[in-house]
Design a protein with these regions (language model features):
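Short, flexible segments with low predicted structural confidence
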Residues: 40-41, 66, 70, 123, ...
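A conserved structural/catalytic subdomain of Rossmann-like adenosyl-cofactor enzymes
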Residues: 179-409
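Conserved S-adenosyl-L-methionine
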Residues: 84-190, 195-206, 210-213, 226, ...
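Alpha-helix initiation/capping motif
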Residues: 37-40, 58-62, 87, 140, ...
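Non-catalytic, mostly N-terminal accessory regions of nucleic-acid modification and defense proteins
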Residues: 1-106, 164-175, 275-279, 300-311, ...
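Short small-residue beta-strand/loop micro-motif enriched in glycine and branched aliphatics
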Residues: 78-81, 133-135, 315-316
Length: 409
């Protein structure tokens, strides 16, 4: 059978390249290769014959072309299967904005604890624009075995040659350790699964890596603040920056999450919050936000947080809202300007947040345009003037109809 032959060939390629491709093809269940309802022998044959006509060797195409082609296919799948896409694909405009906030430099270490197909790490490599300075600097962990294999292939096809993608449950078993402590990174970024249930709260409550330093949400609450605390503990104490996508509920939910949020505010690591438009993410109608944290705030940012309302900064399309490059630039400029802009941004002090009982809901802070309210006496005057004008118009029309003989006087 042709599919078995292909599977054997893929496994042979994997065995011949253990340093870069180990586990990439064998991570897929045999059913993926042998399901004739999805890919018949005839279609496989046609596909092989078509690809055989193309020159796809390293000498024919650059890594960017091959990598972008692979990424295109990943996005195409995400477009066609929105319900399942959220677990592995983050819209590239969101990724671009997060990487711009982090501003990774050549030589910085970059870590994604929920890396999906590796898109955030690839964008970081593009941003640094120096492949040699990213060697050994890119790290990712992904729970899903097949998705972690896709991530490794994705980075490989984008020209990555020295990166580390591991498979495992980050919250239960973080893979990156140094001297039995969490490894620290210059840049930490992720779009973890929103409000993940049954994520391992019991073990996290006595976490040996200290990731529960501000508290432990329950399994029913979801893992949002567990992810955030893991990422904060993974930041380099001196240079660490962190950008994470979370549901907007983390900004105002009470109970244990409210207590953790209070500690987050008082730590003064939080530099910017961006409330995003709805309908941008696959597979969820939940409104999301980006939290940007910095262990090395500039002097004029200390004790302050920039709140950005980007809920109206998007480009509508038929199937899904998107953020264009222009939209991303507008949001990023609101952060770099770090100023008050009516209906768009507000720089608040920690004291102002304390006065709001540590709620970080954007609409509590960003100023809205003042609507002009017409005094009641003016409304009354305008009403009677309009009523009088209507009566005069009716009288004039009646007069014309009488003159024309259309109605009797």
């Amino acid at each position: 059978m042709i599919e078995i032959t292909i599977g054997n060939a893929m496994n042979g390629i994997e065995r011949a390249n253990p340093d870069t491709l180990s586990g990439v093809f064998s991570s897929f269940d045999d059913a993926n290769w042998t399901d004739k309802t999805k890919l018949s022998d005839e279609r496989l044959k046609d596909l092989i014959e078509h690809m055989s006509k193309l020159k796809v060797g390293n000498n024919n195409y650059s890594a960017d072309v091959m990598g972008d082609s692979y990424e295109f296919l990943i996005k195409k799948f995400a477009d066609l299967s929105k319900k399942n896409a959220g677990e592995f694909y983050t819209p590239r405009s969101i990724v671009k904005l997060m990487v711009e906030l982090l501003d990774p430099k050549a030589g910085d270490t970059v870590y994604d604890p929920a890396c999906g197909t590796g898109g955030m790490l690839i964008e970081a490599i593009r941003y640094i624009h120096d492949d040699k300075m990213t060697y050994g600097k890119m790290y990712g962990q992904e729970k899903n075995l097949a998705t972690s294999a896709i991530a490794r292939m994705n980075l490989f096809l984008h020209g990555g040659r020295d990166f580390k993608i591991t498979q495992g449950d980050t919250l239960r078993q973080p893979n990156y350790l140094e001297n039995d402590k969490l490894k620290r990174f210059d840049c930490v970024l992720a779009n973890p699964p929103f409000s993940l249930k049954d994520w391992g709260a019991v073990a996290f409550e006595s976490d040996k890596y200290g990731r529960n330093m501000w508290g432990c949400p329950t399994d029913k609450m979801g893992a949002d603040y567990a992810w955030l605390q893991h990422m904060i503990m993974s930041m380099n104490a001196r240079t660490g920056r962190c950008a994470v996508v979370l549901p907007q509920g983390v900004l105002f939910r009470s109970g244990k999450e409210g207590e953790i949020r209070k500690q987050l505010v008082e730590s003064d690591k939080l530099e910017c919050i961006i409330a995003l438009s709805g309908g941008i993410f696959y597979s969820t109608g939940v409104s999301a936000c980006i939290l940007f944290l910095n262990n090395a705030k500039t002097h004029n940012h200390i004790g302050r947080v920039c709140m950005i309302d980007a809920s109206n900064i998007y480009t509508p399309q038929r199937a899904q809202n998107i953020m264009s490059d222009t939209d991303v630039e507008e949001i990023f400029n609101l952060y770099t300007d770090y100023q008050d802009v009516v209906e768009k941004s507000k720089v608040v002090t920690l004291e102002e947040i304390r006065n709001k009982e540590y709620s970080l809901a954007i609409n509590n802070y960003v100023e809205k345009k003042k609507q002009e309210v017409t005094p009641p006496e003016e409304v009354r005057k305008q009403y009677f003037e309009a009523l009088q004008a209507t009566r005069e118009a009716e009288a004039y029309m009646k007069e014309l109809l009488i003159e024309g003989g259309y109605v009797n006087e």
